[in-house]
Each structure stands twice: as C-alpha cells, then as structure tokens.
Amino acid sequence: MKVHIHTKFCLICLLTFIFHHCNHCHEDHDHGPEELHRHHRGMTESESSKFSVQDAENEKKYYIEKLFDRYGENGRLSFFGLEKLLTNLGLGEIKVVEINHEDLGHDHVSHLDILAVQEGKHFHSHTHQHFHNHLNAENHTTTSVTSKRNHKCDPEKEAAELPIKADDKHLHDRNHRFHHRHRLHHHLDHNTTRHVHNDSVAHSEHGEPGHSPSPETNKTQEQSEVKSVKVRRKEKGKRKKENSEVNTPGFLPNHDHSEQYEHNRVHKLDRVHSPGHPHAHLPEHSGHELGHGHQELDPDNEGELRHTRKREAPHVRKSAIYSTPSHKDQSEDDRQHECLNVTQLLKHFGLGPNSPISPDLFTYLCPALLYQIDSRLCIEHFDKLLVEDLNKDKTLVPEDKTNIGASAWICGIISITVISLLSLLGVILVPIINQGCFKFLLTFLVALAVGTMSGDALLHLLPHSQGGHDHSHQHTHGHGHSHGHESKEFLEEYDAVLKGLVALGGIYLLFIIEHCIRMFKHYKQQRGKQKWFMKQSTEESTIGRKLSDHKLNSTPDADWLQLKPLAGTDDSVVSEDRLNETELTDLEAQQESPPKNYLGVEEEKIMDHSHSDGLHTIHEHEVHVTSHNHHDEDKAVLRKHSHQWHHRHAHHSHGPCHSGSDLKETGIANIAWMVIMGDGIHNFSDGLAIGAAFSAGLTGGISTSIAVFCHELPHELGDFAVLLKAGMTVKQAIVYNLLSAMMAYIGMLIGTAVGQYANNITLWIFAITAGMFLYVALVDMLPEMLHGDGDHEEHGFCPVGQFILQNLGLLFGFAIMLVIALYEDKIVFDIQF
C-alpha cells in the first residue's frame, strides 16, 4: 500500500517537473519582450492590464483620425465625406452585379470586386491564376508560421523571427479564415502598409508614451493572459475557463466582430464561404453573435487569435456598447431589407444633411454601417432582379392585376378631367382681361405652348419611345462617385434627352435668326417711309403749284371746253377728296416721267375711269387754286395717310392671320369645325400619351399629365379667344370646347387599353404622339408667332416687346419640359385603389 502511494507521488512529481520545465521554456521565451516592455513603459504586469483600455482608446483615435484625414476636413466629417465613405464600403445605394462570378465566390469582397470591374476601376486578366497566386503566398506564410509554432521552446529562433511575428500571425489567421476567398490587390497592399506602421510604432514609442502599443507589448500581455487562463482551466475546469475569458481585459467574446470591423473599414470583409465553417454564412446573426466562429480551435491557436485581435478590441467594445439600445431598430430594418443612404442614416441618428460629424458621433454610426455590410442589403444580382420581376408578373393574383388596371383607368380619367377644366379658366379670364393685356398674355402663352409641346415631344415622348426611360420601377441614383464618373453616368443615362435638347436648340436658333431678319426689314421699311413722307410734305405745295401753272399755260382753250366738271360735283367735301387724291397721283406720275404739255381728248378717253375722274377734279382744283389755304393742305396730308393705312391693312388681312371681321365673314360653323378638328386632334394625342403613360406606371402618367397641363393652358385660352373673336357667345364656346375635350377621353381610353393588353405598342404610341405634338407646335402655332397679326403694329404694339415675350415663353416652356424629363423618375406616388 505504501509502495503504491509512493509510486503515485513520484508520478505526480515527474509530471510537475515536466510541466514546470515547459513553462520555464515559455517564460524564457517571453522574458525578453517583457523586460523590454517594462523598460519602455515602466509598469508592472498588472499596470499594463489596467492600461490596455487607454491603449484601446488610442487605437480607436488613431484609426478614426486616419478615416477623417481621408474623408473629412478640419476634424469633421461632412455629408459628402460620409457619402464617399459609404460608397467605398458599397453602401448608400443598391448596386447590381451583372457579371457571373461563381468562381470568385459570393462574399461581400467578391461583390465589390465585380462592381469595380464593371465600373472600370479594376481588371482581371487571369482570375484563376490570380486566385492561386494569393493562396500560394498565404500558404507559404502559413507554413513558416506553423514551423515557428512547432519550435516554441527554441528561444534563439523565436528571437530572430520576433520583428515579423505579429505580421505573420495576422496573415496566418486570415489564411485560416479566408483561404476560400478571392481578394483584391490593393487590399493586401493596404494591410501591408498597416503592418509596417505597427512596426514603426514599436520603434517610436520611446518618446511617445501616449501612442498605441507595439505588437511585442501586445504579445507579452496576451501570453501572460493565456498562461493564466490555462492554469485556471486546469484548476477550475472548462466552466471556470470560460468565465475567466469573459473577465479578461482583451474583450474576447466579440473578437470576430472586431475583425469584421477592421476589414469592413477597407473592403467589407465580413463573412466567408468556407466549407469548414458553414456557420459563417448566417445573415441573421447580429454583431455580438459572430464571436462564436472560432470556439472549435485548439488552445494554441486560440492564443494567437487573441493576440491578432488585440488591436481591434476597443472598436468591438465601443460597437457593442453603442449598438445595445439600437438592436431592436436594426432587426426591424433587417426585416424590411432597406439599403440606407446617407440622408436616411443620418436621419435615424437625429442628424441632418448639413450636420458635421465629429469623431465621437462617428463611433455611433459604426454599428449601423457594420449591420448594413453584414446584411448585404446594398448588393443585388442582375439575374435575380430579372427573375424576381418575371416571377412578380407571373405570381400576381388576378385581383392584383385588376387593381393595377383599375388604377390606370381611374387616374387617366381624373387627369383628363382636370386638364379639361382649364376651359373654365379660359372662360373666366378672356372676358375679364383687357384687350391690350390679353394680346400680351396671348403672345406669351402661344410661345409657351410651342415651347412645352415641342419640348414634350423631343425631351419626353421620343426618349420614352426609344426605351430611354422605364416607368415600371423607380431608379435610384447615387451621388457618392467622383465628378468625372457622375458626369459620365449622367451623359449615358440622359443621352436621348440631351439629344432632344440639342434639337430644340436648333429650332430656337432658326427662330431667332428669322425673327431678327423680319425685324430688320420692318425697321428699314419704316425708316424709308418716314423719310419719303417728310420730303413730300415739304415739297408738295411748291411742286403742285408749278405743275398747275404749267398746265394752265400750255393747255389750249378748246381743251378746257372738254374738261368741264360733271353735274353734282360742286360739293366742297367731295371736291376736297378728289383734289387730294388727284394731286397725289399726279405727283407720283411727275416723278416717274417728264411732264407733258397737255392731254388731248382722244387720249383722255383711253385712260382709266379713275384717271378721268381725276382730270375733272384737276379742273376744279385749277379753277379754285387761289382759294385754298394751308389748312386745306394739312387736310390733304391727313387724307393721304388714311388712304395708305387702308391699303396696308388690306394687304395684311390676306396673310395667314385673320382679323375679327375676316373670322366673322368666314362663318361660325366653319370656325367651330376648325376648332373641333384642330383642338380635337391635339386633345386626342394628349389623351393617348396620358393613357399609355398611366398603363406603364403611375409616375410616368403623372409626369405626362403635368406636361400636358403646362401646354394646355395657353392652347385653351387661344381657342377661346378665337371663338369669341369669331362672334360666338360664351355658351357656344364652352360647348365646342367640351366637344373637343371628348377626343381626349377617347385617346386616353385607347392608350390605356393598348398599354394594358399590348405592352409592345406603348413605345410606338409615344412616337406617334411626339409626331402630333411637333406638327401642332411647329406647323400651326410657330408661324403665328413669326408672322403675327397686322393689327398689333397699328395699335402701338412694339415688335421688340413681342420678340421678348415670345423668347420668354419659348425658354420657359423648354425649361419646364427639361425639368420634368430629368426628374420624372424621382417623382414617386403610391396610390392604390
């Protein structure tokens, strides 16, 4: 019995000696770094454990400063800086992956790599070779680390490999966790730079006690903590060991989440597709639940993992603390599958777009960013989007299809009704507005109609007919790209709209040129007439008297007998009229040909009757030439102007624009048919466009209705002005306008039916409607702007003022349609019936 007890005692001593010898080797290996750490820090082991929180704060400040130096300004992160950061992380907007990447994996980094290839930021020449090269480099590093770990008890080898041990362990851990993943070149370069910085920190800590600790210091602290954990595990068991890990100041339970944060800071390396770790692909795990990923590893690797994650521990603690009250909100966002942009992210934290973000506030945003990265809400696959759209169309319940169709019909009818009610506005405005003001207003509104209709055709309908826009879903456009990339995306997205804008510019340029030429000719003619009138008014009296004296002296007495006035021409008023007209005709004849001595009787018979009447008045003028005074000459000048105004007015009335008397002579029935046919065709095209747009989507229907609404107001006012000018009553004008509005309902019904049951024809309807709009704008209304009404000039209407109003109307119409074309996709209406 005593022998057995002695034997057991010897075995216990032997085991104790062996264990003590191994621990002595381990302590000898750690003695140099510990003494170096105590020499530089002047602290005991307990003091360094207490100081780890301060080191963590320094590490947090260091990385936040790096981020703020890159994306911020003056120690603050602006809205655009945060937006750029989210874009580099792959957040802020939904990005569609269009390239097949089965060989690269489906992790977040692979998605970002594919998006970089799509955007031209990165290229892959040989994907598989590139992938294996990374694996070979990592496996080589792993081999060296493994061999180094197998010779832990050799102090010389470990002392030689000490400067690069932290770096090798980083790479070993990443190789162990990410050996099934493709990674980018610049990611490895960035991590290498970070490790070099860590080495420099270790050498520069002599004069900077407040900076981050060196990797050697972290290693010493961690190994002492690992040793204490092993002793407690032998003494108290596995349960005590887990409790001691929770109380260790390295913040170990959440180390996997901290690794995720450090990688997400660069390229969102959050999770892995690894056959050996199937639990790593669980999207429902939150930040603190990701820490169980390496509990199956052996104790030796556990110590290295703890050392590797020592630098990221402060971020985990901050994230865990700050994310605790908002965990419920994050789970709700996960159920909603919402990709938050910068504005939404700041709004959830009670901040505005103009609020600068301090480093302390940024620590509150980090958990939300990690959650967005982990849930991958901002990455979609192109093939999945297509499948979802097809499945959505196929899986629609017949009741849902009926509701969608009913909403298109109801919205179309409401839109046409609202637009048709503009006729009542015309009824109210036309009688109230003064005639002079109405002419100014109508000139502006006609130009506005031309601008809106031509702009709607070239900027909205034709781009839609070419498939440039799609109203069936909302487009999201990010703003976090560089200016060059933004301009490139803008040019590609709105290529058809910009080409239509160039076409409008050509129309406007020719309009300006033609209008300027007409104004120049008008002022030139006006100046010539004024000079001629002034010259004739000064020389009229003297030339007339000389000519009359010459005729009296050269005409024989026999001829005077044949030039007696007719009976009834003694009236003074008639004689004055005849006198002035004859005097003007004689003056014109004398300027063209040399004066004749006399006119014989036979020649007088051959002359026109108007000239014979003039000869009678000439005789009367010669008999009473001495009795006329200057007052009579003034009357002659006034009569002359009246005669020439009448002649010019008659000439203008034969132009394309008719006066009120001409419209009355045409007949109310003809005017009514003209309005019904012209305005009806226009309204039919409006209804066709509105119906087709509402059948394609509610947003497109609203934007098209706004476009029609803008150019329908001047059109309706012009129609009422024409009808009332033709002599119609207000009731008749309302009836005829309602008849023309019925064509809009017919067009809307046809457009909606075709859009609902024949989707391929919708684009052709847009093209036909664009042609109708161009015809009405450029053929019917633009000539009226160019030629105008002759009455305007005679009532003091200035051509320069008319030109300015027309330019304002055209440019305003173009601007309205351009704004609608650029921002129609951002108009969202969720109306369900």
UniProtKB/Swiss-Prot annotation:
This protein's UniProt keywords: Cell membrane, Glycoprotein, Ion transport, Membrane, Phosphoprotein, Signal, Transmembrane, Transmembrane helix, Transport, Zinc, Zinc transport
Modified residues (Phosphoserine): S593
Record-annotated membrane-spanning stretches: 413-433, 440-460, 497-517, 689-709, 734-754, 761-781, 803-823
Stretches the record annotates as Disordered: 30-54, 137-167, 200-257, 271-335, 466-485
Reactions catalysed according to its record: Zn(2+)(in) = Zn(2+)(out)
Compartment(s) of residence: Cell membrane; Apical cell membrane
Pfam families assigned: Zip
Modified residues (Phosphothreonine): T538, T555
Inducing or repressing factors: Greatly increased in liver and brain, in response to Zn(2+) deficiency (at protein level).
GO molecular function, one term: zinc ion transmembrane transporter activity
Positions in coiled-coil regions: none
Membrane topology of the entry: Multi-pass membrane protein
Residues annotated as signal peptide: 1-25
Function of the protein: Zinc-influx transporter. When associated with SLC39A6, the heterodimer formed by SLC39A10 and SLC39A6 mediates cellular zinc uptake to trigger cells to undergo epithelial-to-mesenchymal transition (EMT). mediates cellular zinc uptake to trigger cells to undergo epithelial-to-mesenchymal transition (EMT). SLC39A10-SLC39A6 heterodimers play also an essentiel role in initiating mitosis by importing zinc into cells to initiate a pathway resulting in the onset of mitosis. Plays an important for both mature B-cell maintenance and humoral immune responses.
Subunit structure: Interacts with SLC39A6. This interaction triggers cells to undergo EMT and mitosis. Found in a complex with SLC39A6, SLC39A10 and with the 'Ser-727' phosphorylated form of STAT3 throughout mitosis. Found in a complex with SLC39A6, SLC39A10 and with NCAM1; this complex controls NCAM1 phosphorylation and integration into focal adhesion complexes during epithelial-tomesenchymal transition. Found in a complex with SLC39A6, SLC39A10 and with GSK3B that controls NCAM1 phosphorylation.
Name assigned to this protein: Zinc transporter ZIP10
Organism: Mus musculus (Mouse)
Native organism taxonomy: Eukaryota, Metazoa, Chordata, Craniata, Vertebrata
